[in-house]
Amino acid sequence: MPRPQHHALLRAMLKLLLFASIAEHCATALPTNSSNSPSSPSPFTVASLPPTTASSSSSPAVISTSSFDRNLADLVNPEAETSGSGWESLETEFNLATTVDSSTQKTAKEPVLGTAATSIEQQDQPPDVPATTLAFANAFPVPVAGEMGNGNGNYNDATPPYAAVDDNYVPSKPQNLTILDVSANSITMSWHPPKNQNGAIAGYHVFHIHDNQTGVEIVKNSRNSVETLIHFELQNLRPYTDYRVIVKAFTTKNEGEPSDQIAQRTDVGGPSAPAIVNLTCHSQESITIRWRRPYEFYNTIDFYIIKTRLAGQDTHRDIRINASAKELETAMILQNLTTNSYYEVKVAAATFSVINPKKIVLGKFSESRIIQLQPNCEKLQPLLRQSHNDYNLAVLVGIIFSCFGIILIIMAFFLWSRKCFHAAYYYLDDPPHHPNAPQVDWEVPVKIGDEIRAAVPVNEFAKHVASLHADGDIGFSREYEAIQNECISDDLPCEHSQHPENKRKNRYLNITAYDHSRVHLHPTPGQKKNLDYINANFIDGYQKGHAFIGTQGPLPDTFDCFWRMIWEQRVAIIVMITNLVERGRRKCDMYWPKDGVETYGVIQVKLIEEEVMSTYTVRTLQIKHLKLKKKKQCNTEKLVYQYHYTNWPDHGTPDHPLPVLNFVKKSSAANPAEAGPIVVHCSAGVGRTGTYIVLDAMLKQIQQKNIVNVFGFLRHIRAQRNFLVQTEEQYIFLHDALVEAIASGETNLMAEQVEELKNCTPYLEQQYKNIIQFQPKDIHIASAMKQVNSIKNRGAIFPIEGSRVHLTPKPGEDGSDYINASWLHGFRRLRDFIVTQHPMAHTIKDFWQMVWDHNAQTVVLLSSLDDINFAQFWPDEATPIESDHYRVKFLNKTNKSDYVSRDFVIQSIQDDYELTVKMLHCPSWPEMSNPNSIYDFIVDVHERCNDYRNGPIVIVDRYGGAQACTFCAISSLAIEMEYCSTANVYQYAKLYHNKRPGVWTSSEDIRVIYNILSFLPGNLNLLKRTALRTEFEDVTTATPDLYSKICSNGNVPQHVILQQQQLHMLQLQQQHLETQQQQQQQQQQQQQQQQTALNETVSTPSTDTNPSLLPILSLLPPTVAPLSSSSSTTPPTPSTPTPQPPQTIQLSSHSPSDLSHQISSTVANAASPVTPATASASAGATPTTPMTPTVPPTIPTIPSLASQNSLTLTNANFHTVTNNAADLMEHQQQQMLALMQQQTQLQQQYNTHPQQHHNNVGDLLMNNADNSPTASPTITNNNHITNNNVTSAAATDAQNLDIVG
């Protein structure tokens, strides 16, 4: 036997002897099973020690032999010796005991791993502890391998109890961490397991760090894995980025020591697509092409590849030219082409790999451009250039003379007006003063330092923003610093702001108005010229000069100047983005009347109406000039609307951009096209003001050009007012808001859009993905995850810290302020609702404490009490609920059709204060008997709240989830549709998820909201308006139709009003034609149905037409009317079979669409004979289970008939009804086509002779007023019917209905 094998056998024998001595010292021996391998010389019997507790009086044995330390380490680490041959494995457990120095016992701290913006903190690691330093009461598995002959020993598959390893010791560091392969987005590496594992290695943590950003990947280890080399590929990395990689092993208890750090840079990625800016004919055989450098590339651009081919052919020619990343544009001439041919050209950039210099990384190709080569094109281009120059010269001369003429006209008008009007009066409708400002083409790419700033395509903007966020937002810092440095210039003076008499008009000393763009006030009689000052500047919008006026929050001394500016500049919209007081400091003074009328200088301001919403308030103000001579066809009174955003936090930026985007869109759209600029102000008129203006401009740029250029536009408008977008945080918020706007699209939907989108599954799926994009981290739900609070949570829905409801804390009791409840906003208030779970037995008092603390007088309970886990949590008549501070008593109970109302009173124990509470219990929400019941329930809740509106509405369902949030959303959207005529389902759903993640489980939850909204009646009257009376009739009550109100008060010319009136008359004519067509259809339908019924009666040996068929027929399309029972007159014959028992069809009442599906399914199955067996089977099929509609959206749904739960229908005449329905539906389509043609002819006639139609429409309506029916069906775009007659027909045959539900 070779010498090394002798040594290995001796070492194994020595190990067994040492363990036997330990067993003798402790006077206890526990034999273990030995290997039954036939190749083993003899089975081993190894002793182990029993557990020793801390209370044991005997001292543990001390082993200090250095040789034992080394040999035991070899045993614990089975990979210490793997060479050998011929041995089969033995694996045995050893219970070892030694004394451990308490000074060396340190708990291994877990590394603090943050998100993409946090760094890994260096933690103290325990020192290397020899493997012999093991404690009692811990089982250490020791795999043993023997050697004999020339065979290789293997370890057995036994699974030792690794969980018993001492928690104080961790695995050593992984060894030989090596990089194997690198690409642009991945790094492949390998490493060996730790030498000292100290337990079963459950896996590895792979940390990848670049700058301040740390990511971690988990590599799980298989249960019985004995791999000596681990491979892993890091993916989704950034191209051309330096990464540092560290690997740590971990067991089920602890994380091990870090490996040696290794640094690696990823490879470059492909550049983005260049943009071809010029493609022209150079000669009849050559083309000139010019392109712009890609806006995104890594390291450098080494060359370009130009692909050319004849249009329509597959073969192409590649041309490669060297390039430099410093060149913004590149041009070349493509020669040797064919005359009179079309060529397709595209360009791509490429760079060499930094990992493998021989490898080429090709970027994206530009969009293909097509050009035609023509003879003599080289002669045409100089002629075009010369003509262009001559044209420019002519235009320049024309502009100069035109300007000179305009100046003369203005001077003559000025002298004439001074002569005609007294000097003590102002002058009406003077043109606003728009001074000349430096013009900058901000859409052209610019070079700042070594970087190019250009517009970004919409489809790549999210990626662009993500790159700016990388490395701790370093990209934003560089861009904002470039803007700050460039906009500091002495070339833009502010001399008027520094005038001694004007300094007091500045709220802040450093916020002044540039002279070249400031707003000039018209001088008053006897006023000095330098007193035309106000701290305000004209600011450009997107493709519109002087679209905005940016100004500071008015001071009391400047109220008169502010309102003079509003009047003189024809301002219709004021945007205010600040509160009067923030953080205890005065930010703006109240420059409008609190109620009634206030006079500021020569302008009188009257508050007409104030509409308060959750995030902003709209005020309607009437302004009147007191020193203006009223001229013919001119008003001295105008309406101005103030949009006041009230939810901008005192410090920083809003939590989410959706409310801000909605505010920007609505306030900007309210400004009439022919009105003056929008006045925007915050406190200083620079930070939030600039954010608003940039958002509005970029939203319009996205809509018109599908590109975004925040950098260029902000750089442009900063030359018009200083410090716009005042902080880097606001600059970042701008980009994040635009990313959200691009992802969500237009979310304010009209009623007809809600109807269309409720059946658009791809749209709902995409919305759902965007809604649940936010995933909370531990810091967001820290209170909910505390151990003391975990028993207060029913499920996995937790409140976010910033929106959770707080209880009055109890001194010295941790977690006493926690309840699983969240604040949700409604249409009116930010804290309109409290959504919470069904109280558990140990949280009932917490629930009533919450009601008491927050003065909630309305509780809506949506969970049922069927389950024992969801028991009653309110007091009954005999047993009140008492706490240290209050007592809850039951008052009375009222049963309604779909819900139960209970009244309670909460009395204070310390004083006489008491709080009345009404609980509305509706366990069937939202699957009530019919849609009208849904809205009746909502109206009842809001009527209660209008009477007692001191606190929020508490909404309770089982887990505080989808049911409760659906109620909040529907309640808010119903008011929004009444006020704004739009519904923003996406905004409510996403903000609810952000405040209470997990409430939406699928896109079907979002579909439920759309389904309910689609049946929203128009007379909910949920708004409780606070309109103030006025002295003129046209604005007695303000309405959301801001444009029409502005038009009626002199801010828009009369021809616009006339156009609106003409359009209204046209709509009346169309409605009249629709009514006539519907009457004709009804008459034809009745005649056809009578004829069909008569034919059926003659051919079918039936005693009578079953009257129970009438309700079913009323659910068919509008052309199918109920059959008249009087039409069946044929007497029965002797051979008439016995009538079949009536077939009961169960109609679930979950939604009208489900009802339509069941009716249509019944009609579809009518072709097959129905037997009593099948009828009974159909009758008993799960009457309470909702059915998912599978029919196309064209199937008509009848809200008025959805309340019928069950119908009894016989089989007689069923085939005839089905055939007639198909024929009549085809006839209806023909009638609708004829109606559309008549409407088109009417439109053409109106466009030709609008005045004639205007005069005749009144007579036309009067002549037909007496002939119109009292209730005629209205056919909508989706073939829905709303007809009281149909409902009455169904009610007439109520005796034929078999109500089952």
UniProtKB/Swiss-Prot annotation:
GO terms for molecular function: protein tyrosine phosphatase activity; transmembrane receptor protein tyrosine phosphatase activity. Residues 31-63, 1092-1199, 1257-1281 are annotated as: Disordered. It catalyses: O-phospho-L-tyrosyl-[protein] + H2O = L-tyrosyl-[protein] + phosphate. It comes from the Eukaryota. GO terms for cellular component: axon; plasma membrane. Residues 476-741, 764-1016 form the Tyrosine-protein phosphatase domain. InterPro entries: FN3_dom, FN3_sf, Ig-like_fold, Prot-tyrosine_phosphatase-like, Protein-Tyr_Phosphatase, PTP_cat, Tyr_Pase_AS, Tyr_Pase_cat. PANTHER family: RECEPTOR-TYPE TYROSINE-PROTEIN PHOSPHATASE (PTHR19134), TYROSINE-PROTEIN PHOSPHATASE 99A (PTHR19134:SF540). Residues 1131-1142 have a biased composition (Pro residues). SMART domains: FN3, PTPc, PTPc_motif. The chain crosses the membrane at residues 395-415. It is found in: Membrane. Residues 66-165, 173-269, 270-376 form the Fibronectin type-III domain. This is Tyrosine-protein phosphatase 99A. The keyword Zinc does not apply. Residues 416-1301 are cytoplasmic. Pfam families: fn3, Y_phosphatase. Residues 29-394 are extracellular. Selectively expressed in a subset of axons and pioneer neurons (including aCC and RP2) in the embryo. Keywords: Glycoprotein, Hydrolase, Membrane, Protein phosphatase, Repeat, Signal, Transmembrane, Transmembrane helix. The active site is at C682 (phosphocysteine intermediate). Glycans are attached at N33, N176, N212, N278, N322, N336. Residues 1-28 form the signal peptide. Belongs to the protein-tyrosine phosphatase family. Receptor class subfamily. Residues 33-63, 1107-1130, 1162-1188 have a biased composition (Low complexity).
